[in-house]
Curated annotation (Swiss-Prot):
SUPFAM superfamilies from the UniProt entry: Nucleotidylyl transferase, Ribokinase-like
Official protein name in the record: Bifunctional protein HldE
Signal peptide: none
Top-rank lineage group of the source organism: Bacteria
One biological process term in Gene Ontology: ADP-L-glycero-beta-D-manno-heptose biosynthetic process
MF terms (GO), sorted A to Z: ATP binding; heptose 7-phosphate kinase activity; heptose-1-phosphate adenylyltransferase activity; phosphotransferase activity, alcohol group as acceptor
Organism per entry: Azorhizobium caulinodans (strain ATCC 43989 / DSM 5975 / JCM 20966 / LMG 6465 / NBRC 14845 / NCIMB 13405 / ORS 571)
Keyword ATP-binding recorded: yes
Keywords: ATP-binding, Carbohydrate metabolism, Kinase, Multifunctional enzyme, Nucleotide-binding, Nucleotidyltransferase, Transferase
InterPro entries (UniProt xref): Bifunc_HldE (IPR023030), Carboh/pur_kinase_PfkB_CS (IPR002173), Cyt_trans-like (IPR004821), PfkB_dom (IPR011611), RfaE_dom_I (IPR011913), RfaE_dom_II (IPR011914), Ribokinase-like (IPR029056), Rossmann-like_a/b/a_fold (IPR014729)
Active-site residues, as the UniProt record annotates them: 267
Region (Ribokinase): 1-322
Amino acid sequence: MLAETQLAPIAVIGDVMVDRYITGSVSRISPEAPVPVLVHGAERIVPGGAANVAANAAALGAPVLLVGLVGEDEAASQLADALATYPGISLAHMVVDAKRPTITKTRVMSGRQQIVRIDAEVTRACDAAEEAALIGAAEAAIAKAGVVVLSDYAKGVLSDAVIAAAMAAAKARNVPVIVDPKRRTFEAYRGATLVTPNRRELAEATGLPDETDADAARAAEAAGRQFGGDVLVTRAEKGMTLWRQDGRVLHVPAEAREVFDVSGAGDTALAALAVSLAGGQSLEASVGIANAAAALAVAKLGTAVVTRAELRAALERTAAQIAPPGALVSREDACAVVAAWKAQGLRVVFTNGCFDLVHPGHVSLLEQSAAQGDRLVVALNTDASVRRLKGPSRPLQDEQARARVMGAMRCVDLVVLFDEETPLETIKALLPDVLVKGADYAPHEVVGADVVTANGGELVLVDLVAGKSTSSLVAKART
């Protein structure tokens, strides 16, 4: 996703804004009223709202088709100039209406302290002509897009009709839709792949708390039932919680970082999520990438973008901290590590097995697997999984012992356990570039092969060492 590859365009549709920052110094109180006197220092203009999502997506290397509503005014020109600094953003689908001013939020700052915010906006619903123009623009952008983002700030652009048209256009092309919501309930977003409320938005939509991970999962489930899709809750210092329609839940802790400003951090996370999905990452891995991007954003002052180089470096640091070579990690941590490897352009290979008594046949399989790419992930059946497959007398070595042996193999970079009878859910979460199994399987028999190939990966069947198996070793030892 962060490697130098061509990404599918991202259509960002929503409420675009101008964020103006006036900075200066304060050393006294006005004699006219009990307010500080700011000595003007500088001003800067940056994209805000949906435009900030577009800027962040472009900074991460994605082509962007921006759909929004601006006026015929100086603020619109300033926004266009600010967006022009990010190569890859197309404004061809923007709608201009002289009757409506461009939304502008002016923040007056002294150092890192915000003194006041001044909003210049009209939040009335769009009239029929504006709505028709927005629908046409959205449909045209979605026709070219690989991912659709609806950035809803409740400023009038994303009406029921515009949302419905966007959902229909995306469904017709089988394009995923991510929504950053601003409504009190999420029914209007029916058809979305994923909705990403923050804690306040989730509470308003469900009336449920999110203090604990279990609370957040229950509230996310209630929200997901409203529109029929997955829910990612951004929980500030508590990290992120992903609830999926099949009942799976993923909790990602927040990365420890000094927080300077939360302005626009949600936009940054949303953009990183969309870019990651456009790059072929799984949703689970994309959540980890979005979490890392948000951590970088809050360390910056004001509405800011996170660049591809910054995010790649952060992911590399995270991967090194989580998993030294051969480490046994959770599925969630494996997602983060694999995402970091892919961000570096590394080719990730996956194989799996019980690996109870390691023999030359296993070694050959692992060596041939490692030769297919740059990093090898080995998924091990847990003890319970092995017993279900091979009977109560197996495994001979427990899962921790087997994982340690695997991790000591110099060709193995990461070890992850799975408790199911097959590694399908792990494959779906990691989405490796190459899936390797022995040549005793037919391609249609390999679990997860369809998932990997549908994502642009490949299945490789490697030769086995004749006469070498754990079962034969066990039988020989018992005679």
